[in-house]
């Protein structure tokens, strides 16, 4: 009987993860939502995306525009300006990290024909801070990578991104959403945007994948040539250490290096 428990637990965990992925909702940000199709290879997130192979075939460099909040991102109303800035900064950083492994990152003075990547945060579900402390304490007594989150602590993130060609035509797009799971590897946090910050990396990875030509060759990034070094280290050892010691995700030790920038409000896409 005891040998059957792991077999039963795995499908049950998959059901929990699938339920928490959520259905992505259009955030009135993309230049077009036509042709978006569900991603069937994701368990922990829900996503719709599309790619135009012909439009992506010749892309070698991209210009990343600053991330903004979608016009329908009413959820940001509960966030402080500092929280908004930190979240947008993290999206900028992770998109830069992921895209720079695939393309050359062009600066603000890039030629006008350089494809543009634009992204928006469409939903932010707050992480419950009090319950997160209890979750971390409980996790101390539960060995292994799988943790249990207390109800009321589960945050989430919704976001969209697209690549636009020289004439403003959409070459790739994605609508993405994920919420934390009660049972899984999502770390609790004392930050109200802790879960949202953690989910930026998988969003950026999915967005970059949708924008990548099939025959692309991965680029080699060094500390000296890293176009994203303004955001700090790509992997912060201190963040891993903080999670290992406390069981919590600590933004100050894990997220992108802060910058003195204010959060932006989205404007209509320009061709």
Regions found by a protein language model. Give the residues of each.
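Bacterial signal peptide processing site
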Residues: 21-24
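Short secondary-structure boundary motifs at beta->alpha junctions and helix caps
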Residues: 145-158, 164-210
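Bacterial N-terminal signal peptides that target proteins for export
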Residues: 1-10
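Compositionally biased, intrinsically disordered linkers/stalks adjacent to structured regions
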Residues: 184-271
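Post-signal peptide N-terminal segment of mature Sec-exported envelope proteins
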Residues: 28-52
